[in-house]
Design a protein with these regions (language model features):
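Membrane-water interface at the C-terminal end of transmembrane alpha helices
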Residues: 130-149
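Membrane-interface helix-boundary signature
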Residues: 7-18, 57-64, 91-95
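Membrane-helix boundary elements
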Residues: 23-63
Length: 149
């Protein structure tokens, strides 16, 4: 047993990337919440999210965008906890639950965003889904290879 280290130590890039993904959700979520009190950013946020689509009530829309921030930040914290747990004690059950969490969130969130003209969210969701799945899968494969050595 020369190679008794946990497999996640052999794939630090994957683990670091997953942790950064979680951290970016925390930072982004807090940033969204704070923008409610930064009116100079409101036009930029609305233009980024909606482009030229007319908005009936911009103040109400901004409130709902900003109130999502703490939720996104808390997801980042939960993601970090899950990723660290998965890295320390990898199991197929945990892997499946990480993927299930993504599958519950992504299709519904993306569909709602696209149906309301928030196309950038669809692009971001697709990017996060692909990256998160790839990194989790890579971590899982690394763990599986560690078991066979």
């Amino acid at each position: 047993m020369l190679n008794a280290q946990p497999s996640f130590t052999r794939t630090p890039t994957t683990l670091i990337a997953l942790r950064w993904l979680a951290t970016l959700h925390i930072i982004g979520g807090i940033g969204l919440a704070v923008t409610l009190w930064l009116p100079s950013l409101h036009p930029l946020i609305l233009k980024t999210l909606y482009g030229t689509t007319p908005i009936d009530n911009p103040q109400q829309t901004l409130f709902w965008i900003c109130i999502i921030g703490p939720t996104v930040a808390s997801w980042g914290v939960l993601c970090r906890i899950c990723v660290d747990y998965f890295a320390e004690q990898p199991s197929k059950r945990t892997y499946k639950r990480l993927i299930l969490a993504m599958l519950v969130w992504a299709p519904l969130d993306t569909t709602m965003c696209l149906s309301h003209g928030i196309y950038i969210a669809g692009v971001l969701n697709a990017s996060v889904v692909l990256l998160f799945w790839y990194l989790c899968h890579r971590l899982w494969l690394g763990q599986q290879q560690g078991l066979t050595r």
